[in-house]
Amino acid sequence: MSDTTLAKSFEPQTIESQWGPEWEKRGYATPALDPSRPDFSIQLPPPNVTGTLHMGHAFNQTIMDGLVRYHRMLGHNTLWVPGTDHAGIATQIVVERQLDAQGVSRHDLGREKFVERVWEWKERSGSTITGQVRRIGASPDWSREYFTMNDKMSEAVREVFVRLYEQGLIYRGKRLVNWDPVLLTAVSDLEVVSEEENGHLWHIRYPLADGSGHLSVATTRPETMLGDVAVMVHPEDERYRHLVGRHVKLPLCEREIPIIADDYVDREFGTGVVKVTPAHDFNDYQVGLRHALAPIEILTLDAKINDNAPAAYRGLDRFDARKAIVDELDAQGLLESVKPHKLMVPRGDRTGVVIEPMLTDQWFVAMTKPAPQGTFHPGKSITEVSLEVVRRGEIKFVPENWTTTYYQWLENIQDWCISRQLWWGHQIPAWYGENGEIFVARNEEDARAQAAAKGYTGALKRDDDVLDTWFSSALVPFSSLGWPNETPEMKHFLPSSVLVTGFDIIFFWVARMVMMTTHFTGKVPFGTVYVHGLVRDAEGQKMSKSKGNTLDPIDIVDGIGLDALVAKRTTGLMNPRQAATIEKKTRKEFPDGIPAFGTDALRFTMASMATLGRNVNFDLARCEGYRNFCNKLWNATRFVLMNCEGHDCGFDKPEVCGAGDCGPGGYLDFSPADRWIVSLMQRVEADIAKGFADYRFDNIANAIYKFVWDEYCDWYLELAKVQIQNGTSEQQRATRRTLLRVLETVLRLAHPIIPFITEALWQKVAPLAGRYPAGKAEGEASLMVQAYPVAEPKKLDEACEQWAAELKAVVDACRNLRGEMNLSPATKVPLLAAGDAAQLQAFAPYVQALARLSEVRVLPDEAALDADAHGAPIAIVGGNKLVLKVEIDVAAERERLSKEIARLEGEIVKCNAKLGNEAFVAKAPPAVVAQEQKRLAEFQSTLTKLGAQLARLPA
């Protein structure tokens, strides 16, 4: 193999397009089920089939793929199951918009035809996100890919629903739910975004029924007063205690309602008197239950006033009704005041419409009802079991503080509304008789058999509703492994090893997986939950379409032009008026668009930012730095190949380093530099193993970066050049062997984080390093399934580490002297040195090369050095004294130093004036003040050095 076999520059797309499909074709991700090996498995949180990859996905999958590749290389039975979620609401909206563009509604098509259209769209577009997952280098077992609506997953969903119903843990009832009046469906809390908005607080007079006065009631939603069933005060509020039990007249309605007392009331809010509307407020609903107040619904499902309200308001939209009601209250003298008020407004994340609490018939899972006999945990509720397994340590949260959040949510849990008024999703397996009879069954045939057994022979109609998407997602830990069948995968990979997830879905997905898995399998779904932060922009702002700060990870990988980026950010905005602002911001931030960084640079960036529990403020500048790292690694490999190909690299003897083989006169004569880099490698390997164990991907990335860039490239390669040029054949052989073996180990170490570049380079390096599998031609083996490096303490060599530290200190001192004397890199001058003569002689060839010196002259003592220095700057390193012998014009040098000293003194005066100005320190951003303080310190340090130089010049 010649040195031209490795391209001159790193071209990510070429490598990615070759190796991504190749890994998949070879089936490396399919696990062996070897009972003698440890098992490692992980679930890919199924992305929406409608979706495209976002930065959160890219971050999450970098972490998961890093773990999977690491354990696969450790030789574990490793399974990563991929899948996509049918995403009920999101998918239905996409297809309905397509129909709207054709002037057709789903009701025009009918349910069956509409669902067919959704399946057609899924088949056309569903592979978009899985293709993007592949582009990020993810290596799950694609042969096991599932879709939450496929036959096997649907069977598991029906089985779970039927069993829970038979166990009395699923029921149908009328309860208050989040209702989207545009989509006309219940929605989960996760699909509701509450943000602070400017509103009003209306103070309304409710006359006492006996005519003796009135109560002033504060409300932010006057339209719902039509459904009031009481007004409420705090039981200890002296202002109103005497009125409890009496009645007020409900304005605009011909009803009297009671005055009740409840601890829920905040005496400091408004007047301390609030209205109670159980049918349209979650807190009021609980108050209504406590006080046995029958709710009165006053809104239709599309948020218009219904027939329970006075005739004047019927049919009005809720916000039109608000205006009409306020106007009428004002006309009747019942509107006391209107004040500006900030409040949290819940909006549907898909429609942007204000969500209404609505009383509707829905299906629920009982969260706190004890499970019956015959289940894995009889007498305990699914919530109770979910708390116990975490308290017992069967599931651990990383970072641990998320355990408290998990407890708080489960300890205050409400029954789970699992029905949705949609057409796309798992249709609820319940059939109704003509008189409201309910038959829950796995299929219609079973439902008819149930009905017949109960003496019902009439028509059956299936429930129109579908299940909450989170219901099927909660089953994934076991449904994706073949449940309800007992499969080998269930035995090996349940519980899975770790779940990697953002904190935003601990409640909606994580806890529900724990509930369902413990209830149906008796096992926990996973042993560890690694909770990471959210990916935000460089300023820490949440990435959102409306802010115009989103980044597409594929655009970072492939690059994108400015105009295309602007178009992507300004198309499909919920508020098109934001387009101009977003375009201006984008053109300023990315004047040349986004260059192609490649997958490895993106993954390295994500890993480096994965600190425990913190949000990730993604900065493209960091991405550029890691692309530079990839280039550095590529160029270092080219150097190693060019210096090792066709040479004796010390692999002719299969077994070396026996007695006398690895020292002076042996087959390999390893230098202290060779032993130092190998010793340091052991420490890095140990640090990386700890990083994986602790889920500290930032530490893993930093350890790889610092070792490769700061130690191997910046130091060892330079030392190796000297050894190859000046060493004996045994020393050259040892150096080449070390160059190759350390580089090959680096490629294996870094592979879980940067898989593509490491694979491409390993194909070239491993054969030379004697690490390519026997009998395999180049390209036939893969780094993906090689053994992961493990630290060998016996290779630690503290003496050589100390040797390297002292050599570095001498080289750095020489470089600093060159800087002080303004010597150009091309100017080579002699170094005079005195001190530890043996050490200095050993260091001499390295120092001469690395510090760009013409020679290194070791003098017998300091007196000889001082006599020869002629006032030149001196550096002291340990017991060694160093001086660069440069013939200088003393008068000219004195003048130059004096001018520079005067300039620095002037700069110091300016800095002190700024920092002494209280207004500047108080008003300037902290970063600006810190920068000024840093400038002052640098000026003072340089001034001290120049003063010492001036003092050393001969008179």
UniProtKB/Swiss-Prot annotation:
Alphabetically, which GO biological process terms does the record hold?
valyl-tRNA aminoacylation
Q: Where is this motif: 'HIGH' region?
A: 47-57
State its Enzyme Commission number(s).
Answer: 6.1.1.9
| Positions that bind ATP | K545
Compartment annotation:
Cytoplasm
**Which reaction equations make up its catalytic activity?**
tRNA(Val) + L-valine + ATP = L-valyl-tRNA(Val) + AMP + diphosphate
Query: Does the keyword Membrane feature in the UniProt annotation?
Result: no
How is this protein annotated for GO cellular component? Answer: cytosol
Q: Name one GO molecular function term.
A: aminoacyl-tRNA deacylase activity
- Residue ranges annotated as motif 'KMSKS' region: 542-546
Enzyme superclass (EC): ligase
Gene3D superfamilies on file: HUPs (3.40.50.620), Isoleucyl-tRNA Synthetase, Domain 1 (1.10.730.10), Valyl-tRNA synthetase, C-terminal domain (1.10.287.380), Valyl/Leucyl/Isoleucyl-tRNA synthetase, editing domain (3.90.740.10)
Q: State the family named in the UniProt similarity comment for this chain.
A: Belongs to the class-I aminoacyl-tRNA synthetase family. ValS type 1 subfamily.
Q: What does this protein do?
A: Catalyzes the attachment of valine to tRNA(Val). As ValRS can inadvertently accommodate and process structurally similar amino acids such as threonine, to avoid such errors, it has a 'posttransfer' editing activity that hydrolyzes mischarged Thr-tRNA(Val) in a tRNA-dependent manner.
The domain-related comment in the record is: ValRS has two distinct active sites: one for aminoacylation and one for editing. The misactivated threonine is translocated from the active site to the editing site. The C-terminal coiled-coil domain is crucial for aminoacylation activity.
Outline the subunit composition: Monomer.
Protein's name in the database: Valine--tRNA ligase
Its gene name is valS
